[in-house]
UniProtKB/Swiss-Prot annotation:
Effect of residue 1592 to V: In HYPP and NKPP
Chemical reaction(s) catalysed: Na(+)(in) = Na(+)(out)
Single GO MF annotation: voltage-gated sodium channel activity
Protein name from the UniProt record: Sodium channel protein type 4 subunit alpha
Compartment list: Cell membrane
CDD domains: Na_channel_gate
Family of this protein: Belongs to the sodium channel (TC 1.A.1.10) family. Nav1.4/SCN4A subfamily.
Organism of derivation: Homo sapiens (Human)
Phylogenetic lineage: Eukaryota, Metazoa, Chordata, Craniata, Vertebrata
Free-text comment about domains: The sequence contains 4 internal repeats, each with 5 hydrophobic segments (S1, S2, S3, S5, S6) and one positively charged segment (S4). Segments S4 are probably the voltage-sensors and are characterized by a series of positively charged amino acids at every third position.
Chief localisation class: membrane
């Protein structure tokens, strides 16, 4: 066994690789026997074995570690002994292939026939491990995949199929021969990936030989072959591992999701059952027998057409189905069939372009029908009948769709139209709780699983690196020793013959023949072997072979002659100058601008300018590259990534110039756009984000591959399963019976559908699929893609991005404070400007300053912009980052030097560091005159001397705690509390009105407050200060703000009709304005201008009041109708913003957001740059190509055969019915390109853009259906990079930023107010409950029996089962159920109500008043009461109030019962606990979101109230009233449907809309929108709500999920303590807090894991050393501490935990009994053992004495003489003489007993009386307690 162990300790090269022979096998068997014997011995001696694990670097599939060197060719491909010590006694061997990959095999005979030494098996192994074999299999799989993508395979493909099956069978055969089938480890079926192969092959044979009916379904199994690629590509297995891990972890979330969705679905079922079938049906004409007359303004013609009322109120035409035929099935001459009439679709009201009839409702706030139509429940549900709440399953699907937010705006609008706007609440709850919370929980879980997986791999890599370092150290030491030995030998003059490292088993000679060619191989000397080994190791870390470096030095470094070198140096000086960099950067920006200026239509002149510009820029960049090549030599030039990047782009630009006129290569122009990325060189954020994307691309590369495989598999599955159906049943989904755009008939379209599902849009394509191919199959496939692809893989994608975002990556972006060339150049320019300024000022003042003086004065005034040079002159080691306080001081100095109004820029900070950074050593001459810096004002000195925690940054914007304008918590910033108390006994005082600089400039501002007017003024200011500081004043102002905001909500389109309200509002507006002016003036007087205008919140108030003042003045002057004034009035919508500073919750969030704004803006800019590239590319590809010719009457496009281009269309225009029209959102310029990209990235409105792109031909040509099909790929690529990447970067940046802010606050939550933090901590402490008194068992016998029943666990379980059954009965309800079913369900419900009422009554009976002390019981009670009330009321409501809504809401109470299930499930409780912990923060963000919605809806009402009703805007969803606006904005919060709302607003004039249209009831004219305002409105709202607020929501959930899981994954959670206390209650019913020592064993055995110590536990309890009080009692806390210590182990944190537990307990139990422990369990045991020892010793002593006495008595009785008796008196003597002696005590004649004793030859010799049971002392050990010898010895 020595050999392998030595090898693994110091594996010096390939000698460790020994062939596997029969001897090796025998040795293994021998070792296995020895090991078994050793284990048996250890088991008997109870020695615990440390668990052994296989070495991770020697796992099968990994490459042979470098430390083994290169294996010699003779060991490749043959069985070798296993290197891993773990397998030293297991029958395995390894084989290496040429790539040094390890394959591990079982050494048992394969298939019971082939031993490892058989020729067949060795041959199979050689084939299996060969690289060509796996390559061949890989190629086969890929070819097979190509064949699978054929939609109509040719006849010969069958033979190809057989070939593939044959190859796969051959592969499996080889594997089985080489590995064995399934008996041992490392055999064929022990690898789960092989199960895949096996099942695929079996399926192939099954489908071939057995007729199984639906073949296509089974043939789809072949697709799984694509998964085999995963086994061949190494990185993929890790990702798949992470995927599988995350799926395991998702189980709890999945259960919670399904549970929540079920509850919501039940709610939906109760509320909206049957609602979506309510349609507008034309009211039928009255019939009589002879003639049919229609009593109305219109006439009914027997056989002809009915001219219906086509106009509905609104400005749009709604097309009804106009032709009625009296011979329809429902009308005969004598009867009228009502059912047939209302189910005839001809009588429904359809909107133009809609497949479904218009829905309506009967409640007041639901949708209404046009005149002549009635709302009747009939026909099928919308969307082929698949969108409904009629049964539980459809409701569940609808809610799942709502949760994944796919096309949910449609569901939202349908539901609100049918049921009423009040039900928006239902959607709000589900979107926020269901959608945001659950979906992000999935993200949180996946992210966590990935992070864990990642940590594991990182740890492994680190280990390897360390191992490598150790090996190098060993080699070096070894080499040193050898050299020493050599030196010693040389001194001795002797030569060592042979190998100095001879005794070693694995000597270090490595095969270096593959290194440098021609190097002789000297393996004879160990010395050279080791140095070779070191070289090899070093080389392994180098990228290229050595000859490559030699060659590169010769060819790529150009140093030929001296003049050339001189020239080179000059060029180097020029090219490397910072100004050149600045110039190049400006050129890049200009070039980008030039490219962005392209548009359609463009004049020829403009086009020429752009072309010339492009040539110039190409020239500049080419020149830069050539000069750099000369200056740096290619060798140096190509060492830098940026230069390589430059050279590629320049080359592409030149190629593009050459190919400029070739058709179809316009895309090459887009490569020029990559120049934009050169900005990253000097733009840290862009640089960092590119790095982050780079970092994640490695892992993402693998993930993308997995995603691609998944997409491929599902695309093929879809095509195989549904392709035919799409072709055959196409008429069900398309009126013209042509395949729609989204189908699965061929692979490309199938791929697009799967990709669309990954983007989160699955429901619409699924409806089509269900219509053509049946529901079950489509649901299965689509939901699988959705769950696997979208929820898991895409979340893993996000998790990867988030993981590459760590604070380090952000921090590192500054490159350790070095300045880049750009900053140096700008610094120089600033310096130059400053120099010129100072020189001119000197001239003006008549002083000519020397340059030195100028420099000096600059140094004082603005930090001598020589930061760059300063940095260079400082010694390297002193370029440290300045500490934070210095930066804070810098801020103050900046503010007082009048340099900065706002946070100093990095540059200014650099200059400042230069001035007062103690870490820079620069000699500065002494200043000649005093400067600001030397005489800090009073305020500054204060600030410097303030303690750390009271320092406030100078910019109040970021100031989370104090805001003057919310005076509730105003504190004057400067003074220390102590000073304040001394100076100012009456409390706080106002500050100076003006800053000192102002007073110095204008001395008249100085007021003496000690006398005269000044004193009065001071008194007035103090009075104002008191008023303003008063709480009531603040409350009053808040109330006014709320009222004035509320007043804005009334100004809708009906305001002109409501005269009274209008008048009231006008007056109110004036009153509010006066009040706010008054408040502002008071604050000016109280605080002074200095304080007021240095506070950001006050500025906000000031600006908002200004708006009111201006509109007030305009009203007085009669200019209120002026355009600018009107638009100013819309700014009143900002009034609610004033509430921000007053509500602490919102202010906290806003402060957090403001802190994040810089980084958010940075990322936004980077994203815009990213998108700019796609936008310009879009302009290149699509500008002017989206126009089409349309027939305006039928809204149909002309076919390409009728109209081919713009001129043909214009020739038809004289008919008046034709227009040459553009798609509203297009790529005609970069701005519109951005809008298009935003719609694509949010997946809203992207279909129209994509269709237009795919149909586009050339500029001014009529589009043709899918003529440009592969343009889909532009969108696919953009979605991957522009949407997945950039939008997720936002989440990353925001989360990262909040984490950094938290760090600064010392880990406190940044989204919660102090009050809410208390709630949060209370939630966390839920577990620290005191032991409650258990509810005492009642005395009454019957009550007692009930009590026993109710407290049994079985009772609880039964109730849970009943709740589940009740849930099932609720799910069974459907719309239109038969009367029988209604009655049955009613009765079942009655039974359940009786059961639950019974349970409630039983519990009340048993638990008496204690019933209401448990929260869940109260909940149960409420539910029962509501159920009973519901039963009673349902009849009343149906009889007297015909309000189905009320009735339905009451029925919801039953669903409450389902929630009781939560009690039982621990995993779900954790997740809900995370939600509960997030609530306060989420509430704050919700408030902020509501504020934003409020402001935007007011703004929307004033701008878009009258736009034309089309696409997304109709009679219910519009901006006419406040309620409608809020509904629309809620919809857009998730970015749903914003394209529909934007469309009508983009109508800017006729013929799209009519600017002179009269709007009845108001004086406003026209129904046109304002495109620019509309675009700004929607884009800003989407960015604010979707990107910021929603992402903050995500950040908080991720955070709290981590906290909650940490709580639950810790070995001990609050639940465990709760369980401890629950068990305690049973053992300590009187809550004395003590338990008898005798019951301790039972108590710890009754606990649940992890605290439980199972019986036999006596010894364990003794070793716990628990303190005991008199009466042998133990306190509950002591037991808890001991058990906790047992679980967590003894650590430093333990004491802290103990202290907190004690504090919690003391707080919870003020009555804690004071106790003084007198002993401990361990001491008690010691005492017992000692007592037993003493007893035994004493017994022995007694025994000896009785022996002596006995022998004396014996002798005495025999010979009568002898010495004195040893025991003359005492117990022993008396007893013995009583029993054996004479009456007188020393009689010489023996008694008969004694004779008997003597006669008995037994050994007892009269010792019987001294048995322990007879002696009163010492006491016997307690019965039943046997003391084990081992314990006795150890304890004493």
């Amino acid at each position: 066994m020595a050999r392998p162990s030595l090898c693994t300790l110091v594996p010096l090269g390939p000698e460790c690789l020994r062939p596997f022979t029969r001897e090796s096998l025998a040795a293994i068997e021998q070792r296995a026997v020895e090991e078994e014997a050793r284990l048996q011995r250890n088991k008997q001696m109870e020695i615990e074995e440390p668990e052994r694990k296989p070495r991770s670097d020697l796992e099968a599939g990994k490459n042979l570690p470098m430390i083994y060197g290169d294996p010699p060719p003779e060991v490749i491909g043959i069985p070798l002994e296993d290197l891993d010590p773990y397998y030293s006694n297991k029958k395995t061997f390894i084989v290496l292939n040429k790539g040094k990959a390890i394959f591990r095999f079982s050494a048992t005979p394969a298939l019971y026939l082939l031993s490892p030494f058989s020729v067949v098996r060795r041959g199979a192994i050689k084939v299996l491990i060969h690289a060509l074999f796996s390559m061949f299999i890989m190629i086969t799989i890929l070819t097979n995949c190509v064949f699978m993508t054929m939609s109509d395979p040719p006849p010969w493909s069958k033979n190809v199929e057989y070939t593939f099956t044959g190859i796969y069978t051959f592969e499996s055969l080889i594997k089985i021969l080489a590995r064995g089938f399934c008996v041992d480890d490392f055999t064929f079926l022990r690898d789960p990936w092989n199960w895949l192969d096996f099942s695929v092959i079996m399926m192939a044979y099954l489908t071939e030989f057995v007729d199984l009916g639906n073949i296509s379904a089974l043939r789809t199994f072949r697709v799984l072959r694509a998964l085999k690629t995963i086994t061949v590509i190494p990185g993929l297995k890790t990702i798949v591992g992470a995927l599988i891990q995350s799926v395991k972890k998702l189980s709890d979330v999945m259960i919670l999701t399904v549970f929540c969705l079920s509850v919501f679905a039940l709610v939906g079922l109760q509320l909206f059952m049957g609602n979506l079938r309510q349609k507008c049906v034309r009211w039928p004409p009255p019939f009589n027998d002879t003639n049919t007359t229609w009593y109305s303004n219109d006439t009914w013609y027997g056989n002809d057409t009915w001219y219906g009322n086509e106009m509905w109120y609104g400005n749009d035409s709604w097309y009804a189905n106009d032709t009625w035929n009296s011979h329809a099935s429902w009308a005969t001459n004598d009867t009228f069939d009502w059912d047939a009439y209302i189910s005839d679709e001809g009588n429904f009201y359809f909107l133009e372009g809609s497949n479904d009839a218009l829905l309506c409702g009967n409640s007041s706030d639901a949708g209404h029908c046009p005149e002549g139509y009635e709302c009747i429940k009939t026909g099928r549900n919308p969307n082929y009948g698949y969108t409904s709440y009629d049964t539980f399953s459809w409701a569940f699907l609808a809610l799942f769709r709502l949760m994944t937010q796919d096309y949910w705006e449609n569901l939202f609008q349908l539901t609100l139209r049918a049921a009423g706007k009040t039900y928006m609440i239902f959607f709000v709850v589900i979107i926020f709780l269901g959608s945001f919370y659950l979906i992000n929980l999935i993200l949180a879980v996946v992210a966590m699983a990935y992070a864990e997986q990642n940590e594991a791999t990182l740890a492994e890599d680190k280990e390897k690196e360390e191992e490598f370092q150790q090996m190098l150290e060993k080699f070096k030491k070894h080499q040193e020793e050898l050299e020493k030995a050599k030196a010693a030998q040389a001194l001795e003059g002797g030569e060592a013959d042979g190998d100095p490292a001879h005794g070693k088993d694995c000597n270090g000679s490595l095969d270096t023949s593959q290194g440098e060619k021609g190097a002789p191989r000297q393996s004879s000397s160990g010395d050279s072997g080791i140095s070779d080994a070191m070289e090899e190791l070093e080389e392994a870390h180098q990228k290229c072979p050595p000859w490559w470096y030699k060659c590169a030095h010769k060819v790529l470094i150009w140093n030929c002659c001296a003049p050339w070198l001189k020239f080179k140096n000059i060029i180097h000086l020029i090219v490397m100058d910072p100004f050149v960099d600045l110039g190049i950067t400006i050129c890049i920006v200009l070039n980008t601008l030039f490219m962005a200026m392209e548009h359609y239509p463009m004049t020829e002149h403009f086009d020429n300018v752009l072309t010339v510009g492009n040539l110039v820029f190409t020239g500049i960049f080419t020149a830069e590259m050539v000069l750099k090549l000369i200056a740096m030599d290619p060798y140096e030039y190509f060492q830098q990534g940026w230069n390589i990047f430059d050279s590629i782009i320049v080359t592409l630009s030149l190629v593009e110039l050459g190919l400029a006129n070739v058709q179809g290569l316009s895309v090459l122009r887009s490569f020029r756009l990559l120049r934009v990325f050169k900005l990253a060189k000097s733009w840290p954020t862009l640089n960092m984000l590119i790095k982050i994307i780079g970092n994640s691309v490695g892992a993402l590369g693998n993930l993308t591959l997995v995603l691609a495989i998944i997409v491929f598999i599902f695309a093929v599955v879809g095509m195989q399963l549904f392709g035919k159906s799409y072709k055959e049943c196409v008429c069900k989904i398309a009126l013209d019976c042509n395949l729609p755009r989204w189908h699965m008939h061929d692979f490309f379209h199938s791929f697009l559908i799967v990709f669309r599902i990954l983007c989160g849009e699955w429901i619409e394509t699924m409806w089509d699929c269900m219509e053509v191919a049946g529901q079950a199959m489509c649901l299965t496939v689509f939901l699988m893609v959705m769950v696997i692809g979208n929820l898991v893989v895409l979340n893993l994608f996000l998790a990867l991005l988030l993981s590459s975002f760590s604070a380090d990556s952000l921090a590192a972006s500054d490159e350790d404070g070095e300045m880049n060339n750009l900053q140096i150049a700008i610094g120089r320019i600033k310096l130059g400007i400053g120099f010129a300024k100072a020189f001119l000022l000197g001239l003006l003042h008549g002083k000519i300053l020397s340059p030195k003086d100028i420099m000096l004065s600059l140094g004082e005034a603005d930090g001598a912009g020589e930061a760059g040079e300063a940095g260079e002159t400082a010694p390297e080691d002193e370029k440290k980052e300045p500490p934070e306080e210095d930066l804070k001081k810098d801020n103050h100095i900046l503010n007082h030097m009048g340099l900065a109004d706002g946070p100093p820029s990095s540059l200014e900070l650099d200059h400042l560091n230069f001035i007062n950074n103690p870490y820079l050593t620069i000699q500065v001459p002494i200043a000649s005159e005093e400067s600001d810096l030397e005489m800090p004002t009073e305020e500054e000195t204060d600030t410097f001397s303030e303690p750390e925690d009271s320092k406030k940054p100078p910019q109040p914007l970021y100031d989370g705690n104090s805001s003057v304008c919310s005076t509730a918590d105003y504190k004057p910033p400067e003074e220390d509390p102590e000073e304040q108390a001394e100076e100012n006994p009456e409390g706080e005082q106002p500050e100076e009105c003006f800053t000192e600089a102002c007073v110095q400039r204008w001395p008249c501002l100085y007021v003496d407050i000690s006398q005269g007017r000044g004193k009065k003024w001071w008194t007035l200011r103090r009075a104002c200060f008191k008023i303003v500081e008063h709480n009531w004043f603040e409350t009053f102002i808040v109330f006014m703000i709320l009222l004035s905001s509320g007043a804005l909500a009334f100004e809708d389109i009906y305001i002109e009709q409501r005269r009274v309200i209008r008048t009231i509002l006008e007056y109110a507006d004036k009153v509010f304005t006066y009040i706010f002016i008054m408040e502002m003036l008071l604050k000016w007087v109280a605080y002074g201008f200095k304080v007021y205008f240095t506070n950001a919140w006050c500025w906000l108030d000031f600006l908002i009041v200004d708006v009111s003042i201006i509109s007030l003045v305009a009203n007085w002057l009669g200019y209120s109708e002026l355009g600018p004034i009107k638009s100013l009035r819309t700014l009143r919508a900002l009034r609610p913003l004033r509430a921000l500073s007053r509500f602490e919750g919102m202010r906290v969030v806003v402060n957090a957001l403001l802190g994040a704004i810089p980084s958010i803006m940075n990322v936004l800019l980077v994203c815009l740059i990213f998108w700019l590239i796609f936008s310009i590319m879009g302009v290149n590809l699509f500008a002017g190509k989206f126009y089409y010719c349309i027939n305006t009457t039928t809204s149909e496009r002309f076919d390409i055969s009728e109209v081919n281009n713009k001129s043909e269309c214009e020739s038809l225009m004289h008919t008046g019915q034709v227009r040459w029209l553009n798609v509203k959102v297009n790529y005609d310029n970069v701005g519109l390109g951005y809008l298009s990209l935003l719609q694509v990235a949010t997946f809203k409105g992207w279909m129209d853009i994509m269709y237009a792109a795919v149909d586009s031909r050339e500029k001014e040509e009529q589009p043709q259906y899918e003529v440009n099909l592969y343009m889909y790929l532009y969108f696919v690529i953009f979605i991957i990079f522009g949407s997945f990447f950039t939008l997720n970067l936002f989440i990353g940046v925001i989360i990262d930023n909040f984490n950094q802010q938290k760090k600064k606050l010392g880990g406190k939550d940044i989204f919660m107010t102090e009050e809410q933090k208390k709630y949060y901590n209370a939630m966390k402490k839920l577990g620290s409950k005191k032991p409650q008194k258990p509810i005492p068992r009642p005395q009454n016998k019957i009550q007692g029996m009930v009590y026993d029943l109710v407290t049994k666990q079985a009772f609880d379980i039964t109730i849970m089962i009943l709740i589940c059954l009740n849930m099932v009965t609720m799910m069974v309800e459907t719309d239109n159920q038969s009367q029988l079913k209604v009655d049955i369900l009613y009765n079942i419900n009655m039974i359940f109500i009786i059961i639950f009422t019974g349970e409630c009554v039983l519990k009340m009976l048993a638990l008496r008043q204690y019933y209401f002390t448990v929260g869940w019981n109260i909940f149960d009670f409420v539910v029962v009461i509501l159920s009973i009330v519901g039963l009673a009321l349902s009849d009343l409501i149906q009889k007297y109030f015909v309000s189905p809504t009320l009735f339905r809401v009451i029925r919801l109470a039953r669903i409450g019962r389902v929630l009781r299930l939560i009690r039982g499930a621990k995993g779900i409780r954790t997740l809900l606990f995370a939600l509960m912990m997030s609530l306060p923060a989420l509430f704050n963000i919700g408030l902020l979101l509501f504020l934003v919605m409020f402001i935007y809806s007011i703004f929307g009402m004033s701008n878009f109230a009258y736009v034309k009703k089309e696409s997304g805007i109709d009679d219910m969803f519009n901006f006419e009233t406040f309620g409608n606006s809020i509904i629309c904005l809620f919809e857009i919060t998730t970015s749903a449907g914003w394209d529909g709302l934007l469309n009508p607003i983009l109508n800017s004039g006729p013929p799209d809309c009519d600017p002179n249209l009269e709007n009845p009831g108001t004086s406003v004219k026209g129904d046109c929108g304002n495109p620019s305002i509309g675009i700004c409105f929607f884009c800003s709202y989407i960015i604010i709500s979707f990107l910021i607020v929603v992402n903050m929501y995500i950040a908080i959930i991720l955070e709290n999920f981590n906290v909650a899981t940490e709580e639950s994954s810790e070995p001990l959670g609050e639940d465990d303590f709760e369980m401890f206390y629950e068990t305690w209650e049973k053992f300590d019913p009187d809550a004395t807090q003590f338990i008898a020592y005798s019951r301790l064993s039972d108590f710890v055995d009754t606990l649940q894991e992890p605290l439980r110590i199972a019986k036999p536990n006596k010894i364990k309890l003794i070793t716990l050393d628990l303190p005991m009080v008199p009466g042998d009692k133990i306190h509950c806390l002591d037991i808890l501490f001991a058990l906790t210590k047992e679980v967590l182990g003894d650590s430093g944190e333990m004491d802290a935990l103990k202290q907190t537990m004690e504090e919690k307990f003391m707080a919870a139990n003020p009555s804690k009994v004071s106790y003084e422990p007198i002993t401990t369990t361990l001491k008690r045991k010691h005492e017992e053992v000692c007592a037993i020892k003493i007893q035994r010793a004493y017994r022995r002593h007694l025994l000896q004495r009785s022996m002596k006495q006995a022998s004396y008595m014996y002798r005495h009785s025999h010979d009568g003489s002898g010495d004195d008796a040893p025991e003359k008196e005492g117990l022993l003597a008396n007893t013995m003489s009583k029993m054996y002696g004479h009456e007188n005590g020393n009689s010489s004649s023996p008694s008969p007993e004694e004779k008997g004793e003597a006669g008995d030859a037994g050994p007892t010799m009269g010792l019987m009386p001294i048995s322990p049971s007879d002696t009163a002392w010492p006491p016997a050990p307690p019965p039943g307690q046997t003391v084990r010898p081992g314990v006795k010895e150890s304890l004493v």
